[in-house]
């Protein structure tokens, strides 16, 4: 199906490319005219273009002249002239496409064209990069063009405070990473004051390395979270010790391909003996299963220096795709704690989600979206289906002459590594620069050790050397350079033969104390001379390296994605330079072992000798077949994630829209009055027990329950007399009107006490407090629902349809709860005892959970595990030697006789096959988030009546759920 879509998408490429060529011709036709303009005349172009837009001209109409202007300014500031293919790429981006341009074709410079053009509308343009360094570097370097033309340039980086971030967003053009843009969106939707908002909309975004951000990280939700209640760190440490006593394949199964584990009967017996319990699968021991599965996963599936590194007593996740450390991020659902326990470092507290959105849904909010990458065509169908983005391959400025050799396959990793070192030694001896791409930190360090033994000088670039990334890559093309890099580390900085001229010139000026931001005039004055000086130094070496064959890229193993292999290869052969690439494989590599067992069997059958490789197109083809299978699987996972997140996205859009309206001062007084009426009517309907006759209603229960929300002064006997002769809807309406009239009178008295302005402000604050709390509870309950919804398929029901249906019901229940709690809070503030509105607000906010201390995070990675950026905080250490049996006894004593011995995870079904138990989502005792988990029902209770269990919820939102 995907292949058919790909073919259909390519059918229109010729027509699109013709349009792009026409744009380049139109720009070239203006070059002489624009080149003749003085600096002042060029600067006057910006106000002229803005006036033309105001007068009704479209961006398409002014595009040729605007592009020609940017090209001329680039020549004068950077010494770089846009090639025709770069003009074509700029037009493709302006029209909302992905421009596929090979490495070294100057994508960063291409982005200046549509960025300037779209910034003329005054609505802001976001340029999205993969890390803070690139955002800062590009905003400085390319910012010279924009600043020359009178545009403001901002840059969002991690450490900035809200006032500074707001200033950066208010600039005409803002650079930043995908995470920073996404988190600021979430923070804006948690703000309590309009003045705290930082973003100003989502008009146009250009995403650099778009495949990395919109494909590789698409399954990663951005999450803002805070610490959950309770300290269960002892359990993680106990289970970390316990699993060391268990044996793989004897006590538990591991499926490395699917990244799941399963406990076997002998293992269950050992666990029960160790913990001193009779049955691991009793409801009281539900949470133990989660600790056990996470401990096994931490032991078998998450490897140090591959999936994570340990630095200064902290477990830091390594991005599988880039090899970069992800500072502050944490795996969710207790997995990170299990890894911390395994490594013997401090086990930090679990977190509770406050706000979340996937990158897919965040970027789909933009009015116009575009992207750049060197490798998008393999994912063209997904880009179109998910983001409505077409992929336009832009031809290279000069023909590609890189030689891509067939793969070499060896029996073992040891043989493969020996061959790699031999090949590198040969290349290094003649001075040819070599880039070795590895799949993990561990692999890079193994290769580095072998190169040290062979006395081959080299640089290592992996997650542990993140800070020097750009500097290492900038000189990786120099004569004799040998660079070992994990996957795509260093992506975003060109490897130029002889050295990266622009980077070296910028570094030299900064070392002398000149910066394009701090000392722009001096920097601009010295730039041409410094650039020419570096060019002269690099020129001879560039030619020498070309004669040696250019950059040799050596892949130490294949990645699951063809795209990432192509990105590694793409580091060589830029701008028509010579180059060569080859991948070395072994039958022990993960891709071969897990996804291509048939090819492995065929190779083994040939009886390979030690150290003897197989080099054949059939091997390369077999590897690509395995990669296609993995890519297809990952695409289906991303599609599935998006389908489920679309349910939440619709709800989130409505909630955030309403919240923004309240935050920005919309008068909600009429809404409050409607909340009062709706709440009263809901309670009346809950008390009538389905009877139309008022004499059959539970009047005592009605007024008792109603007084917990609105302390009504209406006399029960008087009401019964008035409605005695009425039935059905008329009776309900009459009772409602009497109680609502009394409530409004009380509310009016409240307004007289604190004034109209004071009450409006109080209403706004109360609604925000309640909405935030209920939305967090809703996220919590939707997570529960999603965790167990897959099991509905066993009952011949579509899990997605079930999730949509129940999610909608839960959303409606949340809306009712927001109305009810808002009314309850407003009527239970003792206004007479509160001197000012601020004090009243403080009283309200004390009733809601505080979200001042938050953690920022990113969720399920490619393995389906969630990652979370946790806030810093002190975690009280438990005694490492605490015995597990004693811990269970203590927990039982604390919870009371006959109650669960552990904080039970809640009503979500447990998938033993996947080992997924959301233990981090334990209900808070005072909130009783899942009181209906005991399975009880109370027949005869009205669905809107208070639940007899005493939780304070309506029956339908509590134990009434057990009747479904």
UniProtKB/Swiss-Prot annotation:
This is Protein translocase subunit SecA. Transmembrane segments: none annotated. ATP binds at residues 86, 104-108, 494. The lineage of its organism: Bacteria, Bacillati, Actinomycetota, Actinomycetes, Bifidobacteriales. The gene is secA. GO terms for biological process: intracellular protein transmembrane transport; protein import; protein targeting; protein transport by the Sec complex. It comes from Bifidobacterium longum (strain DJO10A). Residues 848-964 are annotated as: Disordered. Part of the Sec protein translocase complex. Interacts with the SecYEG preprotein conducting channel. Has a central role in coupling the hydrolysis of ATP to the transfer of proteins into and across the cell membrane, serving as an ATP-driven molecular motor driving the stepwise translocation of polypeptide chains across the membrane. Zn(2+) binds at residues 947, 949, 958-959. It is found in: Cell membrane; Cytoplasm. It is an enzyme of class 7 (translocase). InterPro entries: Helicase_ATP-bd, Helicase_C-like, P-loop_NTPase, SEC_C_motif, SecA, SecA_CS, SecA_DEAD, SecA_motor_DEAD. GO terms for cellular component: cell envelope Sec protein transport complex; cytosol; plasma membrane. It is a peripheral membrane protein. Residues 871-882 have a biased composition (Acidic residues). Residues 889-900 have a biased composition (Low complexity). It comes from the Bacteria.
